[in-house]
A protein has these predicted regions:
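Conserved beta-strand signature within the Rossmann-like core of class I S-adenosyl-L-methionine
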Residues: 128-136
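Residues lining the SAM
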Residues: 107-110, 134
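Helix-to-beta-strand junctions that scaffold the AdoMet/dcAdoMet cofactor pocket
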Residues: 113-114, 126-128
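Short, Asp-centered acidic motifs that coordinate Mg2+ and/or phosphate
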Residues: 103
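Conserved N-terminal segment of class I S-adenosyl-L-methionine
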Residues: 1-97, 107, 117-121, 143-164, ...
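A short helix->loop->beta-strand "cap" motif at the edges of active sites that frequently abuts
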Residues: 62-63, 127-129
Length: 187
């Protein structure tokens, strides 16, 4: 007969490793969650080291995906580890990117931007039809020096003037993913 484990005996180091693993899995989960809705040519804004870009590129509905980031080190890592015939990684500022696409994804980026309106300008320049914007749904600026501000859904929706909210995904009550679609003109 198997004994029921009522206690978990861990060291501080083991506990820290588990916590880091959970955080890593949750970051990956955000990409895994949205990839089912992606299609055509996709832009991954602030793609970091490229794991999320690569993960979503496995969706057969995606023609190609470009991950952009301002970190040369991150882009070098992405190009060394995740480049495929569908994935391209570029060291580029959001303000300078202008390749047309169908969908834009921005996973935990908007709170890092001094001016979040540059994402709207990017959406207009690239003429995307849909966007997936994720952000922390709790206050983070008091402990994360890289976050310029905290957001609520309405504030983000107001930034994207030509888009409407069509869906909200709430992950673990700590991150929200907004699915936005461009308004279609009836003219």
């Amino acid at each position: 007969m198997s004994k029921v484990r009522e206690r978990i005996y861990l060291t501080k180091d083991e506990l820290k490793d588990i916590e880091i693993d959970i955080l890593n899995r949750r970051h990956i989960e955000r990409y895994a969650m949205i990839r089912q809705w992606l299609w055509g040519n996709v832009i991954d804004v602030s793609c970091g080291c490229g794991y999320g870009t690569h993960l979503v590129s496995n969706n057969p509905d995606i023609t190609g995906i470009i991950g952009i980031d301002i970190s040369e080190e991150a882009i070098e890592w992405a190009n060394s580890n995740f480049i495929t015939d569908k994935c391209l990684f570029l060291k580029q500022k959001i303000e300078d990117f202008d390749i047309k696409a169908d969908v834009l994804i921005s996973i935990e980026t908007i709170e890092h931007l001094k001016d979040p309106h540059i994402l709207n300008e990017l959406a207009e320049r690239t003429q995307v039809s849909e966007m997936f914007i994720s952000y922390p749904s709790k206050k983070t600026t008091h402990y994360n020096k890289h976050h310029y501000r905290d957001f609520i859904d309405d504030e983000i929706i107001r930034i994207f003037t030509n888009f409407k909210l069509v869906d909200v995904i709430d992950l673990h009550r700590e991150v929200r993913i907004l699915k936005l679609q461009r308004y279609v003109s009836s003219i």
